[in-house]
């Protein structure tokens, strides 16, 4: 089955500064924004609403991928969590044997329910990446959200 309405938002941060434990990761600047329905009156329902937040405003399934190379000052455990409207959905953990870079990837599919009018808690969905486990001194990251709507 082909995709009738494919949407992508990709953000990149090549200079993440220090982030404390439980802090939100800065997602950076938009490097790619694609909508096959552009100009057809169909809204682009993926947007960056803050330096650390991506907002999903229409029902559907969204593939989320966060990958980063994060620098730690000493041996530690680095954990990043995908947060949706303040609730942790998923997390991944990597260990660092000593000071240096830790590569971490967080893939997850997120569903946004369509009954926004009846239950406004469902929409919009604000996605954030939260640092847990250990503070970082810097790094780079890529955050990508895509969806395909047919019909």
Features from the language model and the residues they span:
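Extracellular jelly-roll beta-sandwich "head" domains, especially the C-terminal globular C1q domain
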Residues: 1-151
